Amino acid sequence: MPLKKNARALPVPPPPERRRFRRRLLTWYRRHGRDLPWRKTDDPYHILVSEIMLQQTQVDRVLPKYAEWLLKYPSMDVLAAAPEREVTETWYPLGYNIRPRRLQSIARESVAKYGSQLPSDEATLLTFKGIGAYTAGAIRSFAFRERAAILDTNVARVLFRVFVAKGDPKSHAMRRHLWTLSETLVPMRHVFDFNQALMDFGAMICVARNPKCLICPMKKSCRAYPFDAPISHRGHSGHGG
């Protein structure tokens, strides 16, 4: 769950800057967003499967396994009843084999306690072992279309570069601030598109190495532009426009 204590030690962008960021991001996404199968469903189980699979695994490796998995385990009930060894074998070769066990554990708890459904509220989602703050936010915004923030590696990198660009991006204090930024930026409408856009932007434009700054729609206001040195050594000088 996002930690809010002392999270506002760093300033959040004023409303005009937030609106400008949302507008530019959504415009870019509608032109360049990836066409992915889990974006064509609002089934909470399907969203859960995609989010667990995408942890530590590239999209192109997940795509065929996602389709295979849902063909074999089309519902929480089917997954909950499946033999554990079979579930692990079906997961191969995605790796990190704790993930299929946690996914099946979530399915079993959902069947036992919630009528084979995932709950939509954050507090209950966070009681499931294997669902953290990011996954809970993804389920709430992608499956239930609720106004919920997300913060994974890609999103954190985008927000840090565009709005901060100084300090240690991996510190606990910065992580709290980036959660606050994400919560502040989430729009009242188009939450699904906005959060998907953030992830795509971090995966396609604001990448970890050699980001595509020259074609970036945020370059006029990005605090890190142009990104040509370790971010922790850069300040706002000349790039806060």
Region locations from a protein language model:
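Short, low-complexity, charge-dense intrinsically disordered segments
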Residues: 233-240
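Catalytic cores of DNA base-excision repair glycosylases
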Residues: 2, 10-17, 24, 28-231
